[in-house]
A protein has these predicted regions:
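N-terminal Rossmann-like NAD(P) cofactor-binding subdomain of oxidoreductases
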Residues: 1-62, 165, 186-192, 196-200
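Hydrophobic alpha-helical scaffolding
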Residues: 14-15, 69-71, 176
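A generic structural signal for alpha-helix starts
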Residues: 19, 114-117, 181
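A general structural signal for well-ordered alpha-helical segments in protein cores
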Residues: 21, 77, 105, 183-186
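C-terminal substrate-binding/catalytic lobe of Rossmann-fold NAD(P)-dependent oxidoreductases
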Residues: 33-36, 41-170
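NAD(P)-dependent Rossmann-like dehydrogenase/reductase catalytic/cofactor-binding core
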Residues: 150-202
């Protein structure tokens, strides 16, 4: 978090999941009060997972990634407070690694401060957020599945069909994203620092 400077020597673009979660929370918190929530990233299996079962100290991560849904921890919650301080310690994060090659689905459940907020209010806020973050945030109105978003370089594709209100003030949301979006944000960071270097040289 904080302004970029030519004096920076180590920078990070976070992760695909952290970026998607932060975009969602930033957009919604600008319109509504959010008390707390939880996030589950339904995530393609990764290069550090085994393709076949083996004898390991972590019984879950030593199982075949290509054959299992594997509950896992996620560090997005640790970084969230650095990026959006208002949410420090307020969002529980976890992951399910599933046997697909790429891509993720973000399942976020939020406890809203105002019980009057509806599912359509959330969808409208995300449509407005997509309009103000072109090329980074998108909204999907059709009943899609993951293969429909492969090749999309946006970091968050909010699925309006997945927004549900439960009880008085709980909102469930679904959003799609894939690693291409994270690669695009890495390029954005490189371009930003390239511009800063040119300004300093001038």
């Amino acid at each position: 978090a904080g302004a970029a400077s030519p004096s920076d020597r180590v920078v990070s673009a976070g992760s695909a999941t952290t970026t998607a979660l932060c975009l969602l929370l930033q957009i919604l918190s600008e319109r509504f009060g959010i008390e707390c929530g939880s996030m589950t990233s339904i995530h393609a299996y990764t290069s550090d997972q085994a393709l076949q079962d083996y004898a390991g100290s972590d019984f879950r991560r030593s199982r075949s990634a290509a054959k299992n849904i594997i509950p896992n921890s996620h560090e997005a919650g640790l970084w969230l407070g650095d990026i959006l301080p208002a949410f420090d310690g307020k969002i529980l994060t976890s992951a399910l690694n599933v046997p697909v090659r790429e891509g993720c689905l973000l399942d976020v459940n939020l406890v809203m401060e105002d019980a009057a907020v509806t599912a359509e209010d959330i969808n409208e806020a995300m449509r407005a957020g997509a309009a103000s973050h072109p090329g980074v945030v998108g909204v999907v109105e059709d009943p899609i599945v993951y293969s429909d978003v492969i090749g999309d370089a946006r970091s968050l594709l909010f699925d309006t069909k997945g927004t549900i209100k439960a009880g008085n003030n709980i909102i469930k949301t679904l959003s799609w994203y894939e690693n291409l979006g994270h690669a695009a944000r890495l390029l954005d960071v490189v371009r930003l620092y390239a511009k800063l270097d040119k300004r300093e040289a001038a």
